[in-house]
UniProtKB/Swiss-Prot annotation:
ATP binds at residues 4-11, 133-140. Belongs to the ROK (NagC/XylR) family. NagK subfamily. The keyword Ion transport does not apply. Gene3D superfamilies: 3.30.420.40. Keywords: ATP-binding, Carbohydrate metabolism, Kinase, Metal-binding, Nucleotide-binding, Transferase, Zinc. Pathway: Cell wall biogenesis; peptidoglycan recycling. It catalyses: N-acetyl-D-glucosamine + ATP = N-acetyl-D-glucosamine 6-phosphate + ADP + H(+). It comes from the Bacteria. SUPFAM superfamilies: Actin-like ATPase domain. Its EC number is 2.7.1.59. The lineage of its organism: Bacteria, Pseudomonadati, Pseudomonadota, Gammaproteobacteria, Enterobacterales. This is N-acetyl-D-glucosamine kinase.
């Protein structure tokens, strides 16, 4: 059995998957915020409960919103302070007496989608998350690509390309990102960025779902906003896809529920790619909230 943990700032979610990659059981508990020992206990107790339930010693994979910094799994995870700066993988491996795999939650999302029955035919899969932030991951032949600093797929921290400024105007404000850099595309393409763009152009403070509801009602202002956002997304993706050249692009996160993104993006991309380039197949993520658990569990299928 394959145990996949999706760990976030509020919850620790465990999914147990069988050899056919089907979910057999899941359970969620609150994430301890201040005590590392309590955090380890919470994870280990879930593993022990799963072992007893299924009568096996399952493999353990963990997806967490952070970046492993060393081989022992020490990670930077601002949203999970109890585990940040701790040798999480090494400590869990010792306590559970088994190999524990650890990766960024966005990489786990991409891996989950790459291992979908319909998508395994594609050698190079790019996962793109358009949610609270912008992130993603790359999977080549069923294995996540991490890079020496574990930052592969941090697409949100690429800066706005020149074509974006041509589209938006050269007086378009370059916003400071939480990472400290200026003009990161996350500030414009995330759910929060989607709302910020609307306020910037129309001086109205609405959240993304409210703007999308107006678009669905045929509101002209919302329509113009969505057109501008999709053009900006296509411009930024043109740079990324020229570098990565994936066979499949899977889009997840809250904005992926807005069908116009997947249905209208494909027609905009070719003008931002090399003439000889083929745009990838574009699909909405298949596995929703279970994607993080799936991808973490499948870290043990990548050998």
């Amino acid at each position: 059995m394959y145990y996949g943990f999706d760990i976030g700032g509020t919850k620790i979610a465990l999914g147990v998957f069988d050899s056919t990659r089907r979910l057999q059981w899941e359970k969620r508990v609150p994430t301890p915020h201040t005590s590392y020992s309590a955090f380890l206990d919470a994870v280990c107790e879930l593993v022990e409960e799963a072992d007893q339930r299924f009568g096996v010693k399952g493999s353990v994979g963990i997806g967490i919103p952070g970046m492993p910094e060393t081989e022992d799994g020490t990670l930077y995870a601002a949203n999970v302070p109890a585990a940040s700066g701790k040798p999480l993988r090494a400590d869990l491996s010792a306590r559970l007496d088994r190999d524990v795999r650890l990766d960024n939650d966005a990489n786990c999302f991409a891996l989950s989608e790459a291992w979908d029955d319909e998508f395994t035919q594609y050698p190079l899969v790019m996962g793109l998350i358009l949610g609270t932030g912008v992130g993603g991951g790359l999977v080549l032949n069923g294995k996540p690509i991490t890079g020496q600093s574990y930052i592969t797929g941090e697409f949100g921290h690429m800066r706005l390309p020149v074509d974006a400024l041509t589209l938006m105007g050269f007086d378009f404000p370059l916003r400071r990102c939480g990472c400290g850099q200026m003009g990161c595309i996350e500030n414009y393409l995330s759910g929060r960025g989607f709302a910020w763009l609307y306020q910037h152009y129309y001086d109205q403070s609405l959240q993304a779902p409210e703007i999308i509801a107006l678009w669905e009602q045929g509101d002209e202002q919302a329509h113009a906003h969505v057109e501008r956002y999709l053009d900006l997304l296509a411009v930024c993706l043109g740079n990324i896809l020229t570098i990565v050249d994936p066979d499949l692009l899977v889009i997840g996160g809250g904005l992926s529920n807005f069908t116009a993104i997947t249905t209208q993006l494909a027609e905009r991309l070719p003008r931002h790619l090399l003439p000889v380039a083929r745009a990838p197949r574009i699909e909405r993520a298949r596995h929703g909230d279970a994607g993080g658990m799936r991808g973490a569990a499948f870290l043990h299928l990548t050998d």
